[in-house]
């Protein structure tokens, strides 16, 4: 059952593929902000996936983040998503990213529950 307080953690290692220089968001070999955002969204998606009706998924519609500190190649980054509100199909999350014990990013994220077939038929 979807309820406030559900949490999920996603993890990734910083590689050349998820660095700013590779994703086009900067010129340095550090963990890219777009990669951090994707990891946060992944944590939120997985947080609620087991509780969705068959044939449903969630789609991200809003994210507001601050990327506080850089992370080097080889660092293990963890993103934690906590479900803070369920408003019908609208799901609100607090999200944070960590490099070890250091918070490197934080923010809020909104997802909506959608019927996959109906959603895809509108494309």
Model-derived features with residue positions:
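Catalytic strand-loop segment that frames the active site of acyl-thioester-processing enzymes
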Residues: 1-31
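C-terminal binding/interaction regions
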Residues: 3-9, 86-93, 99-121
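Hydrophobic beta-strand-centered segment that forms part of the acyl-chain substrate-binding groove
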Residues: 45-78
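Conserved N-terminal beta-strand and adjoining loop/helix that marks the start
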Residues: 34-37
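Hydrophobic residues in beta-strands and at strand termini
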Residues: 14-16, 67, 113
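Short, charged, solvent-exposed linker or helix-capping segments at domain edges/interfaces
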Residues: 22-24, 120-123
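Hydrophobic beta-sheet segments that form the core/acyl-binding groove
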Residues: 65-100
């Amino acid at each position: 059952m979807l309820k406030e307080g559900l949490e999920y953690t996603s993890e990734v290692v910083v590689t050349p593929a998820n660095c700013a220089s590779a994703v086009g968001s900067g010129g340095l070999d550090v963990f890219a902000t777009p990669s951090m955002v994707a990891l946060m969204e992944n944590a939120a998606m997985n947080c609620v996936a087991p509780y969705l009706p068959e044939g449903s998924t969630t789609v991200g519609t809003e994210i507001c983040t601050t990327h506080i500190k850089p992370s080097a190649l080889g660092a293990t980054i963890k993103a934690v998503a906590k479900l803070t509100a369920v408003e019908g199909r609208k799901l609100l999350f607090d999200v944070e990213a960590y490099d070890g014990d250091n918070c490197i990013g934080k923010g809020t994220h909104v997802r909506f529950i959608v019927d996959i077939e109906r959603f895809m038929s509108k494309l």
